[in-house]
Amino acid sequence: MATTETATDREAIASVVQLYIDGASKGDAAKLEEAFHEDARMFGSLGGQRYDVPISALIEEMTSQPLDSDGSFEARITSIEQVGDAATATVEEDGCWGGVSFTDFFTLVKIDGSWKITVKTFAHTGGEMPAA
């Protein structure tokens, strides 16, 4: 299968995903808004609750409850795949809200020369959510 991935695109994709990581960890709405397309959505399930929400709901949640609540948050981009103006990226997150782990799958699209996250799908991979 042929790929049209370039180093420049790969770096740009990684930068956009890093904006998400930085914004979510510290509750920085400006970074999150820069990373996501305005019509992006988030999907997943956590504690029996299914999520299918506009990205504005994620941004609101991350600004009110940043992932790095106690300094133990770690995230790493584990893969980036790109063909033309479409890409995927996977992020492993540990220490969310003190001890919850997730795997995030991002779909990105290059629009007018800029990469934007259009979909975030997450899987809860460990730890218990803190009591509200």
Regions found by a protein language model. Give the residues of each.
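Short beta-strand segments enriched in hydrophobic/aromatic residues
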Residues: F36, E93-G95, T121-F122
